[in-house]
Amino acid sequence: LKKPLAAGSNALAYDHKTVLAMNPLTSELSLPGWDSSYTKEGMKELLHRYESVDEEALWKNLTVFLKEVVPVAEQADVKLAIHPDDPPWSMFGLPRIVTNKENLRRLLDIVDSPYNGLTLCTGSLGVNPENDVADMLKTFAGRTPFVHLRNIKITGAQCFEESGHISVKGSLDMYRIVKTLYD
């Protein structure tokens, strides 16, 4: 959150090569949004517990969770809205599954209920140039109770920084995205 931008503000920047060079087991690793209460030993234990978890195992765990939680959400009239993985690619050997249109569809199909929904974060999904965020918004309109409008600027392969919201400041067509929401 300390990357200075030309306008004088600071933003989050992500460089996958930098992350690949980090070792969460030997350094005082901290990334934005991480639970800072983990000690080095706690982080080692956490990563050790996930060593055998691949994408399919994560899908299986998410399926069990959603099948238990969504009926309760329905009874309480609470719409769930999962946030996409940010970034939408593996880090430190940990799988990511809420990453693209196909996986969003798979997630929603686990429990076909309006209470099993998406937080459609334009930045998280938009850092992958293959993701057409406006198309995703249109496709999943009825299952998206929350939209997180965030523009990003792709600065290289798996590298990005947050940017101003208007389209010309970043890599996303924010006008098209907002127009899709409006329509």
Label for each model-derived stretch:
Residues 86:
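Helix-loop segments that flank and shape redox-cofactor active sites
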Residues 40-49, 56, 60-79, 89-183:
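Histidine-acidic metal/acid-base catalytic patches
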Residues 1-63:
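Active-site-proximal, glycine-rich beta->alpha crossover segments in alpha/beta enzymes
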